[in-house]
Amino acid sequence: MKTIIKIITVSIICTGCSEDFLVQPPLNAPTSGNYWHNEEEAIMAVNSLYQTFRMDNAYNCGHILLGDMIADDMTIGGAASSFLPLDDFSFNPGSAHINGSNDSYGLWGVWFNTVYRANWVLENIDKVEKISEEIKTRSINEAHFFRAVAYFNLVIYFGDVPLFTHLIGPDEATSAERTPANLVWQQVEKDLLKAAGLDNNLNPSGTPLPPKGKYELGRVTEGAAYAFLARVFLYQEKYDKAEIMAKKVIDLGRYDLNPDFGANWDNMMENGIESIFEIQY
């Protein structure tokens, strides 16, 4: 009898309890609501931008192969390769390397992922109270650099694309219209000029990204911003400005051609004197 009473009592207690205590916010991972407290968190947020460059259809391999295949600088063998639609120009918005697959972002997604992360940094960095002005400025410039590179790649592949310079939600993401390519190019230039500490006339106007060697290996530098600006101007046939930016890279005195051309493909010679910006693996 005592056993029956105990069972009934326990059953009443269990069925009468609220389950609210079982519903807990994530306790072992950061969220948008509990982030941006200190310098370390700001740096980690910026570091996530570097990670996007290592994704499959970014600079890891897909982005490089896409351009070379479409330009006929290389071809693909076999009949089952996911790159085949690019080789014979039968690709469409649903193709794996454009739209993505179950295990990776496509060309479209990987660069908009970069844009989102850059905007996340730029919209939240001012919330951080415990951060030095030097690291804050560096972080802002890094975010502008990565957003510029992302939109550069989007505009050269797709032309008119949605232009986001702020964080967006699902509704805006699904209803966004394409922005004319010329306005996207303007934003790319604007972001890179900010990262390089230059005004529209290419004169110093602010604090640029740090020089090569000041921080840990692999971070973007003023030289990278100058060099990418030169590339952006070249694509737009703004040759005078491209020449100015290329000369700025040379005048830094930190880069030179490698005496041994083959060393550029030697794993033991990575981040050499000819390297302006390398993705670290």
Q: What are these language model-derived features?
A:
Residues 33, 60-80, 164, 201-228, ...:
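Short, surface-exposed recognition loops and adjoining beta-strand edges that mediate ligand/DNA contacts
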Residues 27-31, 96, 165-172, 208-214:
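Short linear capping/connector segments at secondary-structure termini
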Residues 10-16:
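Hydrophobic h-region of N-terminal signal peptides that target proteins for export
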Residues 38-43, 47, 51-58, 80-158, ...:
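Conserved, well-structured interaction surfaces
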Residues 150-160, 229-238:
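Extended, well-ordered alpha-helical segments in internal regulatory regions
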Residues 17-70, 264-265:
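Membrane-proximal, proline-rich intrinsically disordered regions
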Residues 2-10:
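Sec-dependent signal peptide recognition
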